[in-house]
Amino acid sequence: MKKRIRLIALAALLLANVHLFAQREKLLKNNDVEGLYLTLADFKQDKLTRPTDEQHEGDKIKLKQFFISPDIISIEQGMETKFFKDSIFAIHLINGKNYRFINRTPYLIADTSNLYIYTYKTTKTVFSTSGPHRRSKEVPVTYYYFSLAGEKGVYPLTLANVRKYALTDPAIHIAVCDKFTTDKMLEEINPETGNFIINELILKLKK
């Protein structure tokens, strides 16, 4: 009976790990990358740098463990070019998504309609106590950040930071603070447009 319970517990743990892996940002393959935005100006102008045309044998972009390595290597006709992640603005994928590197960490550029809003998916350990036993489990979590029009300064998406850095107009400041009363509310997205509601409100108030 005890052996059966252990097997059931092990199966549940394996299923949880599979689900957890699906929640993480997936490691990208070399052929996921279409090009690079070397600067913020390039990103705003949609000026994509394609370091390789992939027309020659061996042409490729090597992400070198995309989520932890400090650089990206492109190979074009046998010649290597190194791009440091902290010196370029973003990487553009063939699926249309863009990641901005902040301290070498890839943040998905989720919305640029007003504030630049970024998301970062990872996991965190949660502990619980049941009688004499203390258990831990990994749960998926998404962190939200923002910057002003893609500028260098990036801040956690909280009411305190939005008030401090983004709401310089008194009328907009009051309207935003009246509508959003918790940090969690700032994460709300309009399902029809895919944009963050705070961005839509600020744009509406600016008209």
Task: Give residue ranges: language-model regions.
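Bacterial Sec-dependent N-terminal signal peptides
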Residues: 1-28
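C-terminal partner/receptor-binding element of secreted or periplasmic proteins
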Residues: 171-207
